[in-house]
Regions:
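Acidic, proline/glycine-rich low-complexity IDRs
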Residues: 1-171
């Protein structure tokens, strides 16, 4: 997925059977991808993160909508200069998969349980995983929008879903 008006250089999609069959998507373009002497040695590489997303496999699932979602988040970051950090959360203003009846209507950002953080010549890069939240989970966080509350919710989700795979059928 290269070129055009999309701000990300690309999104790689990997099939994984860890925990359960799912797609593991990883963005590239929020961090410095090519060595640049002038940008070396910084605390963070560009925005300091890349996005990841784990989507439970369904029969003949079209997952391109998830890549569009990542690109839309990238447009926000690149235009506003604001970035995401661990335990931030945002509403999707409707289902994260448009024209579906999923109750997943918000996202939280957590350190990807497998990719975590890396140090590069340009600085640190955190792999922030987008985790789908139900409407009620989002409403709960909205009542007390503190990072510690998001962390508590994520720990609760991890008890039965350690890789935090988003299941569009979750209620």
């Amino acid at each position: 997925m290269l070129g055009g008006e999309d701000p990300l250089d690309g999104i790689s999609v990997y099939e994984s059977n860890a925990q359960e069959p799912h797609y593991h998507m990883v963005s590239y373009g929020f961090s410095e991808l090519y060595y640049d002497e002038e940008k070396a040695g910084g605390e963070f590489s560009k925005f300091g993160f890349e996005l990841t997303f784990r989507l439970k496999k369904e029969n003949n699932e079209n997952f391109h909508w998830a890549m569009n979602l990542m690109q839309n988040l990238a447009k926000y970051v690149f235009k506003s200069g604001k970035w995401f950090e661990e335990f931030h959360f945002i509403p999707a203003n409707g289902p994260i998969k448009l024209e579906s009846d999923t109750d997943i209507t918000a996202l939280a950002f957590v350190l990807d349980p497998e990719l975590k953080k890396i140090d590069t010549p340009h600085g640190e890069v955190s792999f922030l995983q987008m985790v789908g939240l139900t409407t009620s989970e989002y409403e709960q966080l909205k009542q007390n929008p503190k990072l510690v509350e998001t962390e508590k919710l994520i720990e609760k989700l991890k008890a039965t879903n350690p890789l935090l795979i988003t299941d569009l059928n979750r209620k």
